[in-house]
Amino acid sequence: MNFSLSFFTFLFLAVSPLFLAQTTDESEIPFEEPITFSSTRIINGHSIASLPKGTYEMRIEHRFGDFSGTNGGYQNMFGFDYLSDMRIAIEYGVNDKFMLGFGRSKGTGAPYRSLLDGFLKYKVLEQKKGSMPLSMTVISGSSFTYMKNSILQSDVSFFPKASHRLAYFTQLNLAKHFGERFSLALIPTLLHRNYVTQNDQNTLFALGSAFRLKISSRFAILAEYYHVFHNKQFRPSSFYKNSLGLALEWFTFGHNFTVNFTNSGGLGETQFIPYTTENWLKGQFRFGFCVARKF
C-alpha cells in the first residue's frame, strides 16, 4: 500500500465521525471519568483498558519509514515512501473483565514477515476511589510467522521445526490515574522466542512505562518506553535499542485515533521489544497511526 492510499484512508476514517457528531447531543455521550487509558493500546504496547462486554473493535495500524537519518529525509518523503509495517486486527470483549484479539501484520522483514498474532487479556483489579488505588491486567499473547523458509541455515528465518516460528509474551500491566487528566503505567514483560541466532537470547525481560496526559475533552498526549534487560555480550547496545514512542490521541464515542512517532518498526510485543534497532538521536524514528473502531 503506497503513501497516498494509506494517507487518504486514514483521513477518511478520521473525518467521518465529525459529520456523525453534528447530529449527536454531546451530553448523551456516555463517557466515564476519570479514564486511565482510553484505548486498549498505548503506542506500541497494551494499555490497562479493555473492551466492554459484547463489544468488537477493529484496529488498523500503519508504521512508515525513518523520518530522517540515512534512510530518511526529503528524498524518501521523510519515510512516507516506505511502509515499515501494517497490522489489521479484530478484538472482542467477552465480558467486562476478559477480552481477546487476533491480528495479521506484514512484518518488517527484520527478521520476519507474514505474522499472525493473538492475545488474551484479563482485568484483575480496577481503580476505585476509596477502595482500590490502582488497576491491573494480565496479558498473554503469541505470534507465528508463516513466511517462506530461508535456504541458509545461518538465517534466523531458517526454521528446522514449525514450533520455531512461534514467539510468546506475558505481561502485568499496572496503571493509576491521578485525577482526571494524568495517568501512569508500569508494564513488566517476559518474552520468549523459540528460535534465535547464536548471538541472541531466547528469553528477554522488559520493563515498560507510559503516561497519558489529557489536554482536552477529545485529545491526549501519550508517551511509552520499554527498557530491555539483556546480556550485552550477546545483544550489544550499539545495535539493539529500547523502544520509545510519543503520540497524540484523538478519541470520540466509538472511534480512537492515534498519530505517533517511534523508533520501532515492528508492530506487536514479539516484534518491537526484541527487534528495535533504530536510534532517535540519529533521526531514525518514523511516523505511524492507528485507527480503532468499536461496534
Give, region by region, the residue ranges found by the protein language model.
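A mid-sequence, solvent-exposed acidic-amphipathic segment
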Residues: 181-230
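Cleavable N-terminal export/targeting peptides
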Residues: 1-34
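Transmembrane beta-barrel domains of Gram-negative outer membranes and organellar outer membranes
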Residues: 22-160, 165-171, 175-191, 213, ...
